[in-house]
């Protein structure tokens, strides 16, 4: 809490740092057409954005005016809303002069459905502040088809009657959509009904327990409506957004990337974390726009990029290749090209191994893992009961087949990913098997009733969650048994933060960290494998990784930790770039 207070105090002083400036005004940003600010993490960035919103609310209050906010949903703005709620409760920030207009809503969609944006906004913001209910405007997913056109026109009209949006908060989808303005949206579009892109529906599939359950349409504010806002701030977190952020910021204005229309707005700031900024020219290839200090990691990044850009292998790069693409200083310091190429070839070659636990009786000078001890104790942490085999199945297989003591720790039950119809199938099978046992049949009937009578705004009952968790558990055991891991080495941690029954999870607590610490203490591993996916910084993978890091911090003074190496794997969401890889199996 103390460190968070210090963070907020510091950001408070620096809140103007996200204020708009002309894009490309600094030489290293010359390819950028939208001003953007990069923060080290999404929490810091979110607090900064929340403070700008709070300052605007207070300014309007002092002037005796209403503050008109356009609000977004999804994972990106959650921490912004958390900070606004905190400021309301702890600092007395009032929302009585605030009128809000949300960007979008699935169609059709009941307000009380737990997947609705009406539910989302009340869960994360409106239920916790003093805003007048009549000042909350969210597109209505229950409007009849016959009334939709008039309803959408009136939504825009109401915004105009309020004086327009003072501030519009946006996220960005992988298709480049803002709101639900999918590729092909016209810059003059107003609020309307649209058909969702397949990628957008795929991204929402987990929340809806399968893509077939995701609505095919949505109501969204149009591009024209958004561009009329006085101030626009777009949030983007995680590596999954890096590619589309670069297209929006540095590419041409095109209907195929609707967020690129924000280049036309004179008061827009993109607020990014480091992962989301990774494909911007000044971040991805800084040597093209500024003079850089060449260290070993930057050399590797640059040479791998040059190979990919030119379609050449490392050993075929020439002096002219380096000179033409901003690396003349590197050539002068570490060249000629022949020497650079050989050094980089050797660096990458030494990451490749068939022995992830170390090769016995072999010189390990240039190998990624130690020779000793020959038989290592290993913990593979898997956020869900499948990430181990999806992301590092080959490495998993090698570790077992080469004789190491492999433990697998499934951090969460993964019950949220099991669909109702899948759970119902298992429950009905159990009922047929146990039909002579009245006690068991009564429990199974309760489960079946809970599933078949569940309303759209209800979370699963505890019994249903337990059934779904058991389905995932036994799927995992089938995989670990196939690999030859004894059942006693398979650990189902069921971290408490995950067990809410809904999309929104609890923050990491001491109980979560202690469970992980206890397992590490028990096994005393020589190797730990953990999911290093940062595609969604608020997702379960990142939360599980944070819990592991917290546990390791508490245990680092232990003697056995001196012999413990931590390897981060990827694969469920994205892969490591070649220059980042330290062990390729």
Where are these regions (language model features)?
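N-terminal glycine-/serine-/threonine-rich phosphate-binding loop
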Residues: 1-68, 363-365, 372
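Conserved phosphate- and dinucleotide-binding cores of soluble alpha/beta proteins
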Residues: 1-13, 40, 44, 58, ...
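Long, low-complexity, Lys/Arg-enriched
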Residues: 1-35, 277, 285, 294-351
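Glycine-rich N-terminal segment of FAD-binding domains in flavoprotein oxidoreductases
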Residues: 59-90
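Structural motif
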Residues: 68, 99, 166-167, 231, ...
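Short Gly/Thr/Asp-enriched flexible loops that form oxyanion-binding sites at enzyme active sites
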Residues: 80-87, 178-190, 538-554
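ATP-dependent adenylation/pyrophosphate-handling site
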Residues: 95-99, 103, 378-385, 389-465
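Metal-dependent de-N-acetylase/amidase catalytic core
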Residues: 201-209, 214-218, 311, 316-379, ...
């Amino acid at each position: 809490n103390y460190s968070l207070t210090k963070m907020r105090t510091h950001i408070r002083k620096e809140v103007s740092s996200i204020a708009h400036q002309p894009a490309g005004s600094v030489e290293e940003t010359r390819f950028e057409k939208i001003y953007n600010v990069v923060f080290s993490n999404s929490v810091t960035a979110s607090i900064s954005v929340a403070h700008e919103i709070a300052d605007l609310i207070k300014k309007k209050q002092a002037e005796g005016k209403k503050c008109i906010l356009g609000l977004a949903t999804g994972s990106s703005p959650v921490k912004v809303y958390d900070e606004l709620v905190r400021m309301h409760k702890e600092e007395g920030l009032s929302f009585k002069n605030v009128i809000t207009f949300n960007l979008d809503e699935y169609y059709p969609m009941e307000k009380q459905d737990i997947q609705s944006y009406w539910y989302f906004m009340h869960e994360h913001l409106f239920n916790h502040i003093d805003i007048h209910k009549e000042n909350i405007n969210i597109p209505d997913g229950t409007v009849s088809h016959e009334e939709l056109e008039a309803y959408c026109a009136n939504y825009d009209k109401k915004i105009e009657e309020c004086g327009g949006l003072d501030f519009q908060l946006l996220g960005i989808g992988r298709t480049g959509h803002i709101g639900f303005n999918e590729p092909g949206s016209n810059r003059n579009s107003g609020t309307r009904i649209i058909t969702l892109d397949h990628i957008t529906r795929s991204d929402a599939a987990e929340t809806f327990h399968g893509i077939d359950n995701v609505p095919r349409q949505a109501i969204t504010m149009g591009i024209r409506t958004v561009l009329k806002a006085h101030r626009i701030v777009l949030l983007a977190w995680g590596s999954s957004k890096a590619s589309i952020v670069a297209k929006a910021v540095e590419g041409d204005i095109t209907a195929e990337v609707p967020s690129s229309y924000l280049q036309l707005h004179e008061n827009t700031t993109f607020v990014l974390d480091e992962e989301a900024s990774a494909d911007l020219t000044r971040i991805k290839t800084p040597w093209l726009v500024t003079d850089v200090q060449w260290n070993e990691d930057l050399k590797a990044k640059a040479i791998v990029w040059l190979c990919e850009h030119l379609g050449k292998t490392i050993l075929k790069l020439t002096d002219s290749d380096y000179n033409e693409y901003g690396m003349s200083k590197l050539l002068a310091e570490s060249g000629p090209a022949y020497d650079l190429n050989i050094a980089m070839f050797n660096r990458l070659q030494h990451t490749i191994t068939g022995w992830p636990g170390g090769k016995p009786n072999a010189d390990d000078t240039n190998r990624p893992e130690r020779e000793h001890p020959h038989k290592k104790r290993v913990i593979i942490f898997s956020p869900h009961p499948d990430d181990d085999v999806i992301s590092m199945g080959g490495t998993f297989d090698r570790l077992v087949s080469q004789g190491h003591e492999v433990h697998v720790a499934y951090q969460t039950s993964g019950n949220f990913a099991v669909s109702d119809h899948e759970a119902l199938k298992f429950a009905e099978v159990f009922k047929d098997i146990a039909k002579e046992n009245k006690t068991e049949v009564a429990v199974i009937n309760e489960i079946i009733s809970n599933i078949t009578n569940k309303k759209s705004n209800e979370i699963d009952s505890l019994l249903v969650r337990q059934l779904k968790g058991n389905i995932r558990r036994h799927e995992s055991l089938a995989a670990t048994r196939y690999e030859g891991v004894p059942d006693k080495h398979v650990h189902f941690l069921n971290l408490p933060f995950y067990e809410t029954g809904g999309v929104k999870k609890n923050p990491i607590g001491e109980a979560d960290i202690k469970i992980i610490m206890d397992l590490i203490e028990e096994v005393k591993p020589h190797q730990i494998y953990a999911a290093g996916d940062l595609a969604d910084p608020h997702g379960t993978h990142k939360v599980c990784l944070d819990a592991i890091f917290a546990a390791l911090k508490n245990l680092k003074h232990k003697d056995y930790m001196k012999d413990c190496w931590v390897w981060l794997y990827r694969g469920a969401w994205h892969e490591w770039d070649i220059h980042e890889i330290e062990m390729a199996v």
